[in-house]
Amino acid sequence: MTEIHRAEHARRTEFLGREFLTWMMARSARDRESFKLPSGETFDVVFERAVTLDGQNPAKDRSLLKVDEPTESEEVRLSLRLGKQVSVARVNLIHDGREFHLTILAADLGLRGIRLPEMEGDDPDAAMPFRMDLCDQVEALVQGLFLSFIRLRLDPEAWKREVASIGRWVDNLPIPDSEDEAT
C-alpha cells in the first residue's frame, strides 16, 4: 500500500477510533468499569484524569479536559453533547490484579506511555521476558476491547441500542437494566 493510500485509508477510518474510545468511556461509566472480552476474561477500565475530545475539525474544535473522574464529568458530557468524541484517553486497565496505565490515541489506536506493573524479584535475566509478556497482555486487552466494539458496531440493531444507551449516559439519564448486556 503506497503512502498516499495509507494516509487516505487512515483518514477514512479514523472515526472508528474516536467512536471506540467514546464507547469505551460510556461503557466504563455504565458498567462500573467492568468489561468482558470475547474470550470470557473480565477486566476493569478506569479513565484517568486527562481526556481529549475532538469535533469535526480537530484543528479548531478540540477540548483537553483534566478532571478527576472523566466518566462522571459534566464538562466531558457537555463536549459529547456538542458532537465531540474522545480522541485521546489516559486509562488504567486492571487485569488479574495488575494495573497497566497507558494512553490510547484514536487516530491509529496507538498505545503510548505504557506504565507496567513492577516485577517481583531481582532476577535481571527474567525482567525483559516478563516485561515483554506484560506488553503483550496490554495489547491483547485493547485488541479484545476493539474486537468487541467492532462486533457491536457491525450489528445494526445492537449498535442502535448502544448509541441510545450512550446518549442517555451523555444526557445523564437513567439506563434501564435490560441494557446491561455484555459485549
Where are these regions (language model features)?
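Intrinsically disordered, low-complexity, charge-rich terminal extensions
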Residues: 1-183
